[in-house]
Swiss-Prot record:
Gene: rlmH
Compartment(s): Cytoplasm
Protein name (record): Ribosomal RNA large subunit methyltransferase H
InterPro entries: Alpha/beta_knot_MTases, RlmH-like, tRNA_m1G_MTases_N
UniProt KW keywords: Cytoplasm, Methyltransferase, rRNA processing, S-adenosyl-L-methionine, Transferase
Binding positions for S-adenosyl-L-methionine per the UniProt entry: 72, 104, 123-128
């Protein structure tokens, strides 16, 4: 199952991008034997003052056809890392070819796009900068592969 991180805005070179790239490369290596990956980031332009509706339209165009859509949103469900790993495995086992995680811009995800999502995850009640959400998601995607493979990376 291919993993797509569809996000508003361009992440410039820097420590966040370096970490995201590292976690996604690790995921690609560890997930391959599990039927997970590759992972890639799809960035859509952050249209200044265009609003969430315009961002939602760009995000919809970036979504792979037929992909399962999972939004990252403060209203989403808070789940543990092992539960997240089980979600990924379940979607893979259902025969889904593509999983698209959607990360909105500074104002979040347009309600119409949130309504189209198959699932929504929250990283807690706090609001996180959307660039940090990318990093946390990349780490959790990698962590999921290690949990599913029995690697000692995730300690309980």
């Amino acid at each position: 199952m291919r993993v797509h991180i569809c996000a508003v805005g361009r992440l410039r070179a820097g420590p966040e991008k370096t970490l995201i790239d590292d976690y996604l490369q690790r995921f690609d290596r560890s997930g391959r034997a599990l039927g997970l990956g590759p992972a890639r980031v799809i960035e859509v332009e952050d249209k200044k003052n265009a609003g969430m509706g315009a961002e939602a339209d760009l995000l919809r165009k970036a979504l792979p056809k037929g992909a399962l859509i999972c939004t990252l949103d403060e209203r989403g469900k808070v789940i543990s890392s092992p539960d997240f790993a089980e979600k990924l495995a379940g979607w893979r086992d259902m025969g889904r070819q593509d999983l698209a995680f959607v990360i909105g811009g500074a104002d979040g995800i347009d309600p119409s796009l949130r309504a189209e999502a198959d699932f929504s995850i929250s990283f807690g009640k706090m609001v996180w900068p959307h660039m940090m959400v990318r990093l946390m998601l990349a780490e959790q995607v990698y962590r999921s592969a290690t949990i599913l493979s029995g690697s000692p990376y995730h300690r309980v």
